[in-house]
Amino acid sequence: MEVQKGLIEAFYNTYPLEKAKELDKSPLCSEYELFIKELWPSIVESFHNSTEFETAIRFCCYETARKSEIGLEERLKCLFAILDLLVIGNEINESFCDHLLPFLILEELMDIHTVNECAKLYEYFETRPSLMKGIVSNRGRGPVLLRISNELLRRLSRQENSSFCGRIDILLSKAFPPEERSGANLRGDYNTVHSFGKVELSPPSTPISDRTDLSYHKKLNTLFTAYWDLQCMCSNPPKLLASDTLPKFIDAAGSAIQAFESILQNTFFNGKSNPTIDPNSSSLLSEKYITLDKGFPSKYIYSRSLFEYQLSDEDFRLQAILQLIIIFDFLLDHSKERIERRTLEKWTNKAVIPIVILSDEDTSKLNELSKEAYSFLHTARCGSVQRTIKEIIHIEGNWKLWKGLGCPSLEKPLVDKAAIDEAVEGLKKLTNTPVKLRFAMGNAALSRLWEQAGENTLDDLKKEERYRIPSPESFLSGVKADKFEIEEAVRDDDKHFHEQSLATKTWRAFRSAINSHLQNFSDTGLGDVELLCNSIEGKPTTSKITPSIPPAFDIHIIEGEELLEEMKKRENVKHNSQNFASPMQTDAEGDIVQNEEEKESVEVEEGKHKNDLPKVSPKPPTEGVDSEVNGESLVQVNKVLKSEDDNTSEASKDPSSHVKSPENIEKLKQNDDHFEVTEEITSTINSKISEKQENNVAETILEVTSSPKSSENSQKQSEITKKRGRDEEDEPSDLHSSPKRPKTGEDGEIVL
């Protein structure tokens, strides 16, 4: 005792405990560390060796723990101040102070304190995380910490001290990595300590007379046996894979789930109300035994008399369903599908690789039961519990995969120095000034478009005019401006630029109107935007020739002036051919005869034919057709009629020549078929022009109008043609004018 007192006195003389407690408010702070470094030489001089110093520390800790006159908080402060001295002393001089001494002293103190006091002592590890750095489970402070923690877990009750158990597990998870062998359970062993024995049903205490009550009690007894048999089988899951146990488990689980569903639908108790318990009953436990945390599952008593009340408890049914879902997932790990998946994942831990393989029938039954259990959860708790359980099962699948791969380290290895150097070089290249590109936006077109955009932003792309089809009227101002610039242009390149711009705007205007105003295209002349806009607005339009545009712009709706002149000439030739094709009355010698009514109606019909002429759409000239035909070509027709009498024989060979002979004409006059002959001759002319474009137009007219007996008549017609040609030379031809019919006298001769 004197040695003990001497050591304790020597320690307190060199180490002022009160001042140490004041400085140690923040555990292992820098001020406290400086204070210990100043005192350490005097502490070392007070003791002969490290053993004497360690013995003095133990005596001081035991004496402080025995002092009952001071409170627990004050005793803990003194103990923590002494233990902190050991930690700092080990950093100063490892040979004089062992690094295991604080842990060993705490292990000894845990054995002489109660559970509540141990919970306070365990705070020393939680408030000093620096002690957990570099700790391993197989040497140094690691095994001591594991012994302290495991011993406390064995002493603690999971129901009454659940929070303290959680603190221990959290500290161990922070101190040791997940792949630590001591906590990984590599073999997948199950805790079979709380196993059930064989379930025996005791007979009811009171006899049952009513048949309804008899069937109800029989059903209740069957469910009681099935439920507690499930508890016996679930206490050791590997035994469920036996051939004689698995069918019993499937039947018992199915009956339990069906009973829980019938209770949920109020059909299990045969119309009776759910059993209730009198809250004032003296048989109930006191409040301190039943006020437990709602997050901790209750532990139910095995009793037939209480089973009816347990079934009415929703938490009881929920706990049973969750237990079944976990067991179903364990059994389905032995199905063929999951085993094949694990083969592909290349599991290396053979201890957890399933050996027994379920049959397809058992797999389908377990899948159906699992679906029924999840459906019950969805109905009972509106799907919230169901989603939580599915997420937990999914996370557990990841832990199974990790354990099957041999619990590899979850920490990523350090990056190789070569990879770091490569990354640094890449960053330097990114920070260097890039080479200036020829085109900032990738090509010339995009760069020019970007420069023209100016201060336009992405909001401008949302404007309506960016995606709305423009109206033809929107191009009219631009077309007028381009026409003005073309007229005022001095340089050829400026004129060329505005001609291209005019062609583009014209094409876009007609393209925008093609779906809505196609009917107005006939009033636009040869592609005039102004005429198109006037036609759309309902204004009267007049024929207007659009300036010629070079064909290099590929604008097909606008033609040049030369093509326009050729179209006019072709229309004049066609009108003249229709004039010669009109039927006339002839006498026996072939002379033209005209009665008085026809004389009077000649002038009237002249005005009609001006409006009756069909509109001919302009067509581009084709090869083989003479485009120089004009009003003077009719004079050349008379010369051809005089000089080429041999062609009349070829005309008589024409299948349609019998229609044009004088005899047939006389017959047609008798049958009053004057207009039919006219239509047939006109159609013949049109067909000849389209089929024989390589021949001269005058030859086609000669072929239709000539006959063997009309040589004298053709001579008279040539004189008329000469006179008509001279008149047409004096007067310019009009695109919409019609040729006049020749006037004849009473004897049928033509009056010039």
From Swiss-Prot:
One of its GO terms (biological process) is poly(A)+ mRNA export from nucleus. The modification Phosphoserine is found at S202, S582, S707, S738. Signal peptide: none annotated. Residues 596-752 are annotated as: Disordered. The lineage of its organism: Eukaryota, Fungi, Dikarya, Ascomycota, Taphrinomycotina. It comes from the Eukaryota. The keyword Phosphoprotein applies. Residues 601-613, 641-677 have a biased composition (Basic and acidic residues). Pfam families: efThoc1 (PF11957). This is Uncharacterized protein P25A2.03. Residues 695-718 have a biased composition (Polar residues). It comes from Schizosaccharomyces pombe (strain 972 / ATCC 24843) (Fission yeast). PANTHER family: HPR1, THO COMPLEX SUBUNIT 1. The keyword Transferase does not apply. GO terms for cellular component: nucleus; THO complex part of transcription export complex. Keywords: Phosphoprotein.
